[in-house]
């Protein structure tokens, strides 16, 4: 779920335009997924040798994205933030005739972040909004869990807007002293009206104005690989529209639970929210 710009402006150092441009010139060609098999991370697992047809692979009962490399097929598995540390299992092959392959999930500690929200309804919503919030949650879950079986040639992503990275993925958030869901995206502080662009090719799967997220756009990149941008001032796309990498999805704003204009960007794999920084070139993420 989307959250807000942190009050602590020093949480992440500012990235200047000049430094960003220099980093892009040197790193664009190297951009690729950087697997990190931890809770909230991504595991990449070799599952079939070169020359074999694309296998079926599932994790926790859900189909996962397959990418083709020189040595064959690799499963790209999203790991939810509540994934237990230790040995995990994927199933390879059709249901009823599959084999198990194990991999190991390592530990990762995410920092705590305490924030003060002026509008108490955005911390503890009134009773007459609870049905709306529950319906929106279920609708978003369905959208991000959808598996559109199309080839995915690239799993690297572009940052949807250039700016100061103001809040990292996975922060354990406490609003007005009340523990709430962890931060499941990457925040970029940008002025209202800043163009927000598609991080990769895809199809727009949801455009809506949601209670917490505000104006929101989901883009389905295929095989359960989904991006979401929210807190927009306005959306400029429609459901079902095909978008290309870099195409404008909308304008940055502060709709929903936000104290100032910024981009919140979430990435999902096989239904799990994962760290978007793993999909962008390191100089842009760090």
Predicted regions and their residues:
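Alpha-helical and His/Cys-centered functional microenvironments
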Residues: 11, 17, 266-268
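Bacterial N-terminal signal peptides
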Residues: 14-26
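A generic structural signal for short, solvent-exposed coil/turn residues
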Residues: 23-25, 37-39, 49, 56-58, ...
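Non-catalytic extracellular/periplasmic "stalk"
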Residues: 31-164, 168
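Catalytic cores of peptidoglycan-degrading enzymes
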Residues: 158-286
